[in-house]
């Protein structure tokens, strides 16, 4: 492990996504739940590939039911898509399911070429790290609580930008409300291990 930027330790990715847990109480109101949600005539919600991409740029703070739902789908490589959909059925009136962009071919790394699929597959987007399932397990948070409660947010940042920490250091945000910042906690743990290894 090599420190290549101030206060940044290089791992296997250049993203700095973080689960933020605050002391904010309660769930979103029904009106807040609907923010960013559009139901088409068939009462389905379109999940476009371009809206399921969360990388190190641009900087984003995901703090709505809708945006966290998209992140959960993308960051789990689609593993949580069905569970997210069930939660939407519970909270979004008249919701009739997600409709994803589909792919008809994918890259075969053994053959080193694109191959046609027998059947189209949903495109679930992507992230650099695919951390959502690990976060929920590590902090003992259910997917439903993560999506519906105000206290959970996600920061999408890059370690070459560090926009989130520039914002925190500016004094614009009251940091006293932040209980956990997963990326910072992991970085601090790496620093402790690095320091301990150098003592030997």
Task: Give the positions of each predicted feature.
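Long, non-globular targeting/processing and low-complexity regions
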Residues: 1-2, 8-10, 15-200
């Amino acid at each position: 492990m090599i420190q290549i930027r101030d206060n940044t330790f290089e791992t296997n990715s250049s993203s700095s996504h973080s689960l933020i847990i605050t002391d904010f109480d309660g769930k979103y109101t029904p009106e807040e739940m609907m923010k960013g949600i559009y139901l088409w005539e068939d009462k389905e919600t379109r999940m476009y590939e371009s809206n399921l991409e969360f990388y190190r740029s641009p900087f984003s703070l995901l703090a709505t039911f809708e945006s966290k739902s998209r992140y959960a789908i993308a960051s789990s490589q689609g593993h949580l898509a069905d569970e997210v959909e069930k939660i939407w059925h519970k909270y979004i009136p008249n919701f009739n399911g997600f409709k994803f962009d589909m792919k008809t071919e994918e890259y075969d790394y053994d053959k080193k070429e694109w191959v046609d699929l027998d059947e189209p597959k949903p495109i679930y987007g992507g992230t650099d790290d695919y951390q959502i399932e690990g976060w929920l397990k590590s902090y003992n948070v259910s997917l439903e609580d993560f999506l519906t409660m105000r206290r959970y947010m996600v920061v999408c940042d890059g370690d070459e930008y560090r926009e989130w920490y520039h914002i925190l250091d500016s004094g614009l945000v009251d940091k006293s409300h932040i209980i956990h910042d997963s990326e910072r906690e992991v970085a601090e743990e790496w620093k402790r291990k690095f320091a301990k290894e150098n003592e030997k």
